[in-house]
Regions:
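N-terminal transmembrane-helix/juxtamembrane module of multi-pass inner/ER membrane proteins
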Residues: 1-37, 83-88, 92-94
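C-terminal TM-helix exit segments that contain a strictly Trp-centered aromatic cap at the helix terminus
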Residues: 1-5, 65-78
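Membrane interfacial helix-start motif at the N-side
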Residues: 22, 46-48, 96-102
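Alpha-helical transmembrane segments of integral membrane proteins
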Residues: 26, 30-33, 53-60, 106, ...
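Core segments of transmembrane alpha-helices
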Residues: 32-39, 59-60, 109-116
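Interfacial segments of alpha-helical transmembrane regions
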Residues: 38-70, 133
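Short helix-capping/hinge motifs at transmembrane helix termini and TM-loop junctions
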Residues: 46, 72-76, 147-148
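Membrane-embedded catalytic cores of phosphoryl/pyrophosphoryl-handling enzymes
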Residues: 92-176
Length: 176
């Protein structure tokens, strides 16, 4: 989808002008990439049924997100320049080579992380773990802007997408 959108669709820009003043914080790339580990607590902490619910929510979010990308493709207004990056150049080079600056809204990075971490927080019996999962998700949300990969609206739309994806799966389970 990202490749198709980059090469074959005209892009829309959806951001507030003041967002371009937000500095790139290079070490937040570590938090950004930690999203790819956010499935681990699910793997170890939820039952098989929990895994199925999350897998279905990921499928629902992928379908809805791709429809949004096709109808209203958005692009990143930040300029990608490795000279602005002091540390972690290899990480940024990898990210910017693999991920075109398109298909931003909703953020799958946020949606995926929320689909993994919100059920973990909900099912955790430890207040400390609930806070941990919430803080991890909040940091991932902030990281997508601080590494100049997304805009602020992408955070909110990613969270909304994850919420509705989890609710749709729950509703189907209860009425199915």
């Amino acid at each position: 989808m990202n490749w198709y959108s980059f090469y074959y669709q005209s892009q829309n820009f959806l951001y507030w002008p003041w967002e371009l003043e937000i500095p790139l914080v290079d070490w937040f790339i570590l938090i950004y990439f930690s999203a790819y580990l956010s499935f681990l607590p699910v793997f170890f902490g939820l039952s098989y049924r929990g895994h199925l619910k999350i897998a279905k929510a990921l499928i629902v979010s992928g379908f809805i997100g791709c429809m949004i990308f096709l109808v209203y493709p958005t692009s990143c207004a930040y300029q990608r320049d490795l000279n602005e990056v002091e540390n972690f150049k290899l990480f940024y080079s990898f990210l910017w080579t693999q991920d075109n600056p398109t298909t931003l809204m909703p953020s799958f990075h946020v949606a995926m992380s929320a689909i993994f971490l919100l059920p973990m927080a909900k099912h955790s019996t430890s207040y400390g773990m609930k806070i941990f999962y919430g803080c991890w998700l909040a940091l991932i949300c902030v990281s997508i802007v601080l590494v100049h990969q997304h805009h602020i609206i992408d955070i909110f739309t990613g969270l909304i997408l994850s919420y509705f994806s989890l609710k749709i799966v729950e509703r189907i389970k209860n009425h199915g």
